[in-house]
Amino acid sequence: MTISIMGNNVTPIQPNESVNQVKRSPSEAQANFASTLKNAIEDLNHIQLESDKKTEAFASGKIDDLHDVMITAQKSSVTLETTVQVQKKVIDAYNEIMRMQV
């Protein structure tokens, strides 16, 4: 039984040039941050409204699935708590930047 040597078929990993070329102006970065923040707040609002609708529907007897209502309410609660914690971290970071001496 002969064993032949396999060639070196592994090519080295090349750096992704598009990652290195991502340079944004401050206004582009601010616009990106603002749109991300706006989308997160809109998502939170949508989740809160969905939870309210399901809770009202359950209370009025339109739906009987308590499990789904509780999952939606918990999802809403966790999302709100996460948003509040992120807000606190952003404010802390802003205050830290304002304390820096130039």
Curated annotation (Swiss-Prot):
Biological processes, Gene Ontology terms: bacterial-type flagellum-dependent cell motility
Cellular component GO terms held in the UniProt record: bacterial-type flagellum basal body
Keywords assigned by UniProt, alphabetized: Bacterial flagellum
InterPro entries (UniProt xref): FliE
Annotated GO MF terms: cytoskeletal motor activity; structural molecule activity
Domain of life: Bacteria
Pfam families: FliE
Keyword Transmembrane (UniProt): no
Keyword Magnesium: no
Subcellular location(s) per record: Bacterial flagellum basal body
PANTHER family linked to this entry: FLAGELLAR HOOK-BASAL BODY COMPLEX PROTEIN FLIE, PTHR34653
Entry's family note: Belongs to the FliE family.
Name the UniProt record assigns to this protein: Flagellar hook-basal body complex protein FliE
Gene coding for it: fliE
